[in-house]
C-alpha cells in the first residue's frame, strides 16, 4: 500500500520513471530488502503488462525482443518433493530419488536446498547453518550430493541456500559445490551481507 500510492493515477506507460519513483521516493525503497523489492517487482510487472497490452506486443518485445527459441528450465525446490510426491526429504536416498523422478519428467537440471531438513525430515534451525557448521551437518549435505551424483550422473545441480548460510558456512558449502561440479550456488548469504 505504501508503494502503490506512488503509481496510482500516474501514466503506466512511463515504466522506468515509475520504477525510479517507487525506489527513491518511498521511505522503504532504498535498501528495503526482499519484501519491498518483491512489492516493487509485482507493480513493475503489472505496469509492463499494461504497456504491452496498450502497444499490442508481448512483454518480451518491450525488454529487447526474442533472443532464444527455447529456454532451459530446471526442477526447483526438490527438497519439498515433486509433482504429487510432496513432502520434505531427509535421507540421501530420498534426495537422489526425487531428483531421478524430476529427470524422468525430462529435466536435466535440479535445484535443492540441502540445509532445510535433517536426515529425519525435521527443520534445521538457522543458527545451525551459520558459522563453523558441525561435521555432522557438513557430512549430511555431502551424503546427499554424493547420492544425487551416483543416481543421476551429470545432472546439473543448483544448491539453493535461501540465505540461511553466512559467509563462513556459505564458503564451506561452496567448496562442496566446486568438488562435485555444481551448476550454481544460489543465495549463500542474505542480501544484507554484502561481504
Segment roles from a protein language model:
Residues 1-55:
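Metal- or metallocofactor-binding catalytic centers and their adjacent structured scaffolds
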Residues 9, 57, 65, 153-154, ...:
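Short, well-ordered coil loops that connect the C-terminus of an alpha-helix to the N-terminus
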Residues 22, 53, 57-71:
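N-terminal amphipathic alpha-helix/helix-capping segment at the start of soluble metabolic enzymes
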Residues 35, 39-40, 65, 87-94:
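Short, well-structured alpha-helical patches and their helix-loop capping segments
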Residues 46, 58-59, 93-98:
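Short alpha-helical segments and helix-capping/turn motifs at coil-helix boundaries
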Residues 48, 65, 76-78:
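Beta-hairpin (beta-strand-turn-beta-strand) motif
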Residues 49, 61, 146:
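Active-site phosphate/pyrophosphate- and oxyanion-stabilizing loops and adjacent acidic/basic residues
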Residues 70, 75-194:
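Metal-dependent enolase-superfamily TIM-barrel catalytic cores that perform enediolate-based chemistry
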